[in-house]
Amino acid sequence: MNYTIEGAPMPVVICNLEGGETMLTEKGAMSWMSPNMKMETTTGGGIGKMFGRVFSGESMFINRYTAQGGTGLIAFASSFPGDIRAFEIAPGQEIVAQKSAFLASTAGVEMSVFFQKRISSGFFGGEGFIMQRLSGNGTVFLEFDGHIKEYELAPGQQIVVDTGYLAAMTAGCSIDIQTVPGVKNMLFGGEGIFNTVITGPGRVWLQSMPVAQLAGAISPFIPNKN
């Protein structure tokens, strides 16, 4: 499989497959394809994985698209203004991503639920509590919100993030929750009570326009139907 990622700020990834190659995707993610692409809807690994996907914010079912009788083409478009990034997954090169980041992948990539190891992260992490772990072998395409900034963290190096801005990280990074210091800062700072602290070693991808923050910003301007 080879691919190109085109367009901004609403990108699309166009995948060219050899005969017999398969792509996995969420329902409704396919944008266009050649007529020889065969679709099959599956639970993608049984009941346990099916409910695990639901718990991490994804659909119960996975669509498999296979090129039959020769080369095929299939495209997957982003659902929100932002960026599509390709990641090569292999043993020891796992990626942990925000909920609903998964767009498509080759057949060898596996998706599971990633829970924070620290109890405090679970209770107070908000959007960061449940994330997706991408493992196995292959290429995965993730969609992020807004502009993406990447950081390489050395062992023990930290970055403090408003939780919704964490798009993805390599599995070697760890997460904890930090309370905003000072009661006045908590009550009047407008930044919430908790921040996410990411500790290296590893790479971190941060997004500039989380959907939840955008929705909150525009909601006062949406007319009330009542």
Q: PLM features: residue spans?
A:
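Composition-driven recognition of glycine/serine/threonine/acidic- and proline-rich low-complexity segments
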Residues: 1-226
